[in-house]
């Protein structure tokens, strides 16, 4: 799966989970600062990403995922 494919899927999931417009979801978007996620939203988002990509995101890794690109990079590293 290419970075573009991963980003597209992550973007859709983020938009749905955080109830934001897909156009607002950019690689550099911070889940909390730009997209208004609180800590519960972030946990739910991680769970949705785990399910969608059939991966496990450990708590330590989840804490380091602050932006959309962070999520894409982590997923790409697991898919490699």
Swiss-Prot record:
Keyword Lipid biosynthesis attached: yes
Gene Ontology cellular-component annotations: cytosol; membrane
Modified sites of kind O-(pantetheine 4'-phosphoryl)serine: 39
Annotated GO biological process: lipid A biosynthetic process
Subcellular location: Cytoplasm
UniProt keyword terms in alphabetical order: Cytoplasm, Fatty acid biosynthesis, Fatty acid metabolism, Lipid biosynthesis, Lipid metabolism, Phosphopantetheine, Phosphoprotein
MF (Gene Ontology): acyl binding; acyl carrier activity; phosphopantetheine binding
Keyword Cytoplasm: yes
Modification(s) after translation: 4'-phosphopantetheine is transferred from CoA to a specific serine of apo-ACP by AcpS. This modification is essential for activity because fatty acids are bound in thioester linkage to the sulfhydryl of the prosthetic group.
Pathway assignment: Lipid metabolism; fatty acid biosynthesis
Chain ranges passing through the membrane: none
Stretches assigned to the Carrier domain: 4-79
Entries under InterPro entries matching the protein: ACP (IPR003231), ACP-like_sf (IPR036736), PKS_PP-bd (IPR020806), PP-bd_ACP (IPR009081), Ppantetheine_attach_site (IPR006162)
SUPFAM superfamilies for the chain: ACP-like (SSF47336)
Family in the record: Belongs to the acyl carrier protein (ACP) family.
UniProt-listed HAMAP family: Acyl_carrier
NCBIfam families: acyl_carrier, PRK00982.1-2, PRK00982.1-3, PRK00982.1-4, PRK00982.1-5, PRK12449.1
Function: Carrier of the growing fatty acid chain in fatty acid biosynthesis.
PANTHER family assigned to the protein according to its UniProt record, in alphabetical order: ACYL CARRIER PROTEIN, CARRIER DOMAIN-CONTAINING PROTEIN
Name recorded for this polypeptide: Acyl carrier protein
Species the sequence originates in: Synechococcus elongatus (strain ATCC 33912 / PCC 7942 / FACHB-805) (Anacystis nidulans R2)
């Amino acid at each position: 799966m290419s970075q573009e494919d991963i980003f597209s899927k992550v973007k859709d999931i983020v938009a749905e989970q955080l109830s934001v417009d897909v156009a607002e979801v950019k690689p550099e978007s911070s889940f909390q600062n730009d997209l208004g996620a609180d800590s519960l939203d972030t946990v739910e988002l991680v769970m949705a990403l785990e399910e969608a990509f059939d991966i496990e995101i450990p708590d330590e890794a989840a804490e380091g995922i602050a932006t959309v690109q962070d999520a894409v990079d982590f997923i790409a590293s697991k898919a490699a």
